Amino acid sequence: MQFSLASLVYGHRGRALAQPLNATFESGQIVAILGRNGSGKSTLLNTMVALLKPISGEVRISRGHNDGSQEERPLVVHKMSVQERARWVSILLPTAETPPLTVQELVSLGRLPHGNRPLGASNLGESISSSSNLGEKLSGSLHPVEQALELCGISHWAARKVQTLSSGQRQRVMLARAVAQDTPIMLLDEPTNFLDVEATDEVFQLLSHLAQQGKIIIVATHQRDWAQRHAHQVLQL
């Protein structure tokens, strides 16, 4: 699979923030977007996921065949329905207002594009044991929400209200929600904001693990050293 920017011009209110971008990202790659504050990293991510409309150009998804070839007609992200797009691309934005939900309930919202109902404490066990409610089970019989909580190291927070957490803890919850969405393309805007050194390392290890599973991971970050060591491609804005 490929995720590509085709002569993409992005910006605010018709004012371009950069020259046309042409880039192609492959399954299993980590892509770092670097740039000073105000350079347009967040705007670019929002345009990639169609939260903002491009000034010109397209963001495309080319689905691969078993023989490694690509389909002739790619999907254009901005022409997809909201639900279809949410099955292909997820985005982690900087922590904002959080609803009065438990950690488990908020993370389970990532499953809505797949037709799964949000999980509360009363139905998590039921959903894990009933594939008819899930529509799918992951290997090891873990529900995608439970797996996301475990991967992000926050299973012990499942019953806590998100509003009681620190900014760094909320950031990890929102990352778990994006993981639970289980899209082949993940966009992350400064995913290590508010995190200490140990938690930052854990997040970057998780992103490497997800890329090894074949996902395309695109990260807007100020962590230049990490980008130079681990990213397969770097976009400098």
Report the location of each language-model feature:
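The feature captures the beta-strand-to-loop junction immediately N-terminal to the Walker
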Residues: 34-36
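Helix-to-loop junction immediately C-terminal to a conserved catalytic motif
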Residues: 49
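ABC ATPase NBD Q-loop/coupling interface
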Residues: 58-84
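Conserved ABC ATPase "signature" region
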Residues: 140-157
